[in-house]
Amino acid sequence: MIKIENLRMEFEGGVTALDGINMEIQDGEFIALLGPSGCGKSTTLNCIAGLLDPTDGTIRSDEVDITNKAPKERNIGMVFQSYALYPHLRVIDNIAFPLKQKKVAKEERYDRARKMAAKLQIEHLLDRKPTQLSGGQQQRVAMCRAMVKEPKILLFDEPMSNLDARLKIEIREVIKKLQAETRITSIIVTHDQEEAMAIADRIAILDNGRIQQFDTPFELYQHPVNLFVANFMGNPPMNFIDARLVKGEGGLCFLVDGQTVPVPPARAKALAGSLDREVKIGVRSHQMRPVEAGAVGAIRLKVQMVENLGKELLVQAQVGKNLIRISEEDTTKYAFYRGLADVKGEMGILLTDQINVFDSETKANVLMEQ
């Protein structure tokens, strides 16, 4: 288990990169550190690797304090964004290099290098130089080199940033499969939320040097703790609708741009104590039902445009100052929505029990306050 407690990192000039990071990572887990540029994810990884000395806090591996240990004493393998291969060495020598440093016999280190190359399906490339390989092949070599010494912890620092979309999916699948087979405790740094959700068992979302939420992809997507997490997870991003909680004829309602609509039954109890509170309704494109503008309980919106994505339509519509995206599964309605968009006609949406509700001032998820 890796245990990080109160990790702080301050650079010259008073810049705080990490402001109290706390994490527990179980043996065999695959963790993603996710967030925008400058949030502290790579700094956290480099502290774990021993490439940076934190200002304060501790890092433990299996109860052993490794905070101030040299990188070579941590039994860690690391895969970098730039591959960091030796251009003058053959692939097999690049892979075997960590074993050579450990003074492993030549026959054994080549044997282990070949076996690792076979796992990543690059055994036919062993006699080539890095310059003769594609980006995806070079990344596989870098992964082999990191894993050949059988590390206890495997770190990935944005390993797919230099790859095109198709290669990203390929390498993503390779990483996921390899980690599942070896069960090496692994941590990946990425700014791509789809990448993190596809690979990781749990994801830590960072912003301004702090962990905003550390949970499974499902929980982060369905139950974000605040507006930052809600906006960061999902493509398209979560929609936000400004509202106020009011008492209506049938019970608790949202007041949206002068319209009074009922709060979905499954959310009414949790919001009962929030009367007159200014909130933002958080709803994903597929978590609302498109209906006619005059439907009972619907929010009326003005249609701005429609995109045909093949498997669905993505309708953009506006209510007040909020532009939202609505998923429409019936692609035969493209002409209908296109017609509405041309004249800025109205449609309606019905909110479902899947909505989240955030306090407009604190940005916290009101549904998680209990």
Briefly describe each language-model feature range.
Residues 57-65:
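Conserved ABC transporter NBD signature motif
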Residues 34-36:
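The feature captures the beta-strand-to-loop junction immediately N-terminal to the Walker
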Residues 49:
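Helix-to-loop junction immediately C-terminal to a conserved catalytic motif
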Residues 247-370:
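Non-catalytic connector elements of ABC transporters
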Residues 30, 71-232:
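ABC ATPase nucleotide-binding domains
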Residues 14-16:
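Short coil-to-beta microelement around the adenine-binding A-loop and adjacent beta1/P-loop entry
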